[in-house]
Amino acid sequence: YSTSLNAYYESYGADYFFQNVRSIFQKDDLSIVNMEGTLTDETAREAKTFAFKAPAKYAAILSGSSIEAANLANNHSHDYGKKSYTDTISALDDAGIASFGYNRVKIFKVKGIKVGVTGIYELADHQKRASQVKKNIKALKKAGAQIIIVNFHWGIEKQYTPDENQKALAHLAIDEGADLVIGHHPHVLESIEKYNGKYICYSLGN
């Protein structure tokens, strides 16, 4: 327990965790995280090896470090059931942090430009997510997005090269109007591709 996140929160407070990069986040236009875990008091966990949760107050770790938004479309957003997911959304809302993912898209106004973001959880369905990619990008366009960023939770852990599903969905996203594709889940860096003039970062690591 002494080396756990909980112990460090109790000992050092919410400001401890991003202290070395907070100044960077404060200077940028938009800071987005992929949040793998839940902010909930639920106790019935999913049947899986790793399940993550924390109290709602832990949202202050993000809000106090200039994090504006969180992608929740990943394999840990429902670790303690459906309510843990909605609890997380509520906790982030209360902390002033926008969230998006699955069928929930978000528009931010950054220096007068409407930036649209969406999160796609690819791991279970692979190419079946294509229709959601199209639908979400269409929704962002309809909402007036001038720049569209698509976050994919995809790929294989500890693999340094993207697989064919990643490549196909990334290309589809850009063909449909995305300006930037960002990937996560492998926990390691994967390649960056320039496709039709737009960048695809297949995995940002951790």
What positions do the PLM features span?
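Acidic, metal/ion-coordinating pockets
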Residues: Y1-N206
